[in-house]
Each structure stands twice: as structure tokens, then as C-alpha cells.
Design a protein with these regions (language model features):
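Residue-level detector of well-ordered alpha-helical segments, enriched
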Residues: 15, 19, 83-87, 125
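Short helix-coil-helix linker/hinge
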Residues: 76-86, 94
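DNA-recognition helix of helix-turn-helix
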Residues: 113-139
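Helix-turn-helix DNA-binding module
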Residues: 95-118
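N-terminal interaction/assembly modules
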Residues: 1-77, 109-110, 135-143
């Protein structure tokens, strides 16, 4: 597995792809339910009455922080339409489309079958989305 780069260190599309894959790998392993009076912030249980802690201080571990950045900060603002976001989720193994379960990275054949498109069309949509995300990240780095 390649090393996952921080946003400021991303310099090519492959770095963006690795961050997206990494984010879904981290999310796949996190618990969903928290005990009473606790909230689950990406795998770490925090008492809900603790409001004075800064949001970024609640997270532990570099992997979780990087996954949270993709899932929270990038995801809603990146210039990719909802259909391609669903394709990204499905390819990365998230419960998307008709698959209601987590898995590893799905094959292009599975992605094509799910979206009723040719395998090369699925790859092209993926590549176009990754280019758009890369340009978005470059704008973040320049700001």
C-alpha cells in the first residue's frame, strides 16, 4: 500500500485516488453505534456534553484525520455530480447502488454492471471525477 499524502503534499492525480481509496478503507472499519450519552466521531466515542473541545482535537490518529478530511471537507464541495459520487462510493466498496453492504474495492466489471454501462465508460467517468477532485485540491492548496 502506498503512503497516503496530506492535502498540502498532493501533487498528482494518483495521490488523490489513494486518498479516496484510503478514506473508504478507514470508514469501512469504524463502528457505527455509540453508547448512550456518547457520539461516535469517526470511530472515537466522545461524551456529548463536552462542547469546549475543538472539533479537530476530537479525532485520533492520522488515518482517521485524513479520512475525515476527504469525507467531510472535500466530499460536499468537490465539483463532481451525484451520479459520479455514487460510482466512486460503489467502486471503493461502500454500500451504494443496489449493494447494501461494505466490501473491498469492487472490480470495474461490477461497477459497469451496477451502473449499466461499459467497463471503459466506468473507468472514464472515474478518471474524469479524479481529475476534477485533483483540480479542486490544487485550488485548496493555492488558497
Amino acid at each position: 500500500m502506498r503512503e497516503v499524502k496530506d492535502t498540502k503534499d498532493i501533487c498528482k492525480i494518483e495521490d488523490v485516488e489513494e486518498r479516496v481509496y484510503h478514506s473508504f478503507r478507514v470508514y469501512r472499519r469504524l463502528p457505527f453505534d455509540a453508547p448512550k450519552d456518547y457520539a461516535c466521531y469517526l470511530g472515537r466515542f466522545i461524551k456529548t456534553d463536552v462542547n469546549d473541545i475543538q472539533e479537530h482535537e476530537r479525532f485520533i490518529g492520522r488515518d482517521i484525520a485524513l479520512a475525515e478530511e476527504v469525507g467531510v471537507e472535500w466530499w460536499h464541495d468537490m465539483p463532481v455530480d451525484i451520479e459520479d459520487k455514487t460510482l466512486i462510493c460503489f467502486r471503493c466498496g461502500a454500500p451504494a447502488g443496489t449493494a447494501g453492504y461494505w466490501s473491498g474495492v469492487r472490480s470495474w466489471k461490477s461497477v459497469a454492471a451496477e451502473f449499466h454501462i461499459h467497463r471503459n465508460t466506468a473507468k472514464n467517468r472515474w478518471n474524469t471525477a479524479m481529475k476534477a477532485i485533483f483540480e479542486y485540491v490544487c485550488r485548496l492548496n493555492c488558497a
